[in-house]
């Protein structure tokens, strides 16, 4: 972690990355656009809010085995000065058809 922090600080407060895949246990965030990366504070959080544009995808074994699936997406904000995150967005989706790529598209609600 120390080397990463030193590298980010040496680059300056912002560096641009050309794309990223953040793979979770059931879904992944895929972004082909430029992402803002910032310096990390002493407590391990970013010093400023970062914008992470992208799409939710199913990769490999993450693709649901059923024809239609339900799910929810929660966007949480972790403020650096507070202990608890707060929900910025909560979306419930139902009857989403299984697709091998973008998740939560063509859902009924």
Swiss-Prot record:
Keyword terms of this UniProt record: Glycoprotein, Host cell junction, Host cell membrane, Host Golgi apparatus, Host membrane, Membrane, Phosphoprotein, Transmembrane, Viral envelope protein, Virion
Glycosylation site residues: 43
Subcellular location, record wording: Virion membrane; Host cell membrane; Host cell junction; Host Golgi apparatus membrane
Any single Gene Ontology cellular-component annotation: host cell
Protein family (similarity comment): Belongs to the alphaherpesvirinae glycoprotein I family.
Quaternary structure and interacting proteins, as annotated: Interacts with gE.
Role played: In epithelial cells, the heterodimer gE/gI is required for the cell-to-cell spread of the virus, by sorting nascent virions to cell junctions. Once the virus reaches the cell junctions, virus particles can spread to adjacent cells extremely rapidly through interactions with cellular receptors that accumulate at these junctions. Implicated in basolateral spread in polarized cells. In neuronal cells, gE/gI is essential for the anterograde spread of the infection throughout the host nervous system.
Descriptive protein name: Envelope glycoprotein I
Native species: Cercopithecine herpesvirus 1 (CeHV-1)
Chain's gene name: gI
């Amino acid at each position: 972690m120390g080397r990463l922090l030193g590298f980010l600080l040496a680059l300056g407060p912002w560096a641009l990355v050309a794309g990223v895949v953040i793979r979770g246990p059931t879904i992944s965030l895929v972004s082909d656009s430029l992402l803002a990366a910032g310096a990390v504070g002493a407590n391990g959080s970013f010093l400023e809010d970062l914008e992470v544009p992208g799409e939710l995808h199913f990769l490999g074994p993450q693709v649901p085995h059923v024809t239609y699936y339900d799910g929810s997406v929660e966007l949480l904000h972790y403020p650096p000065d507070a202990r608890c995150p707060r929900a910025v967005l909560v979306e419930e989706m139902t009857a989403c058809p299984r697709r091998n790529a973008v998740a939560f598209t063509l859902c009924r609600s």
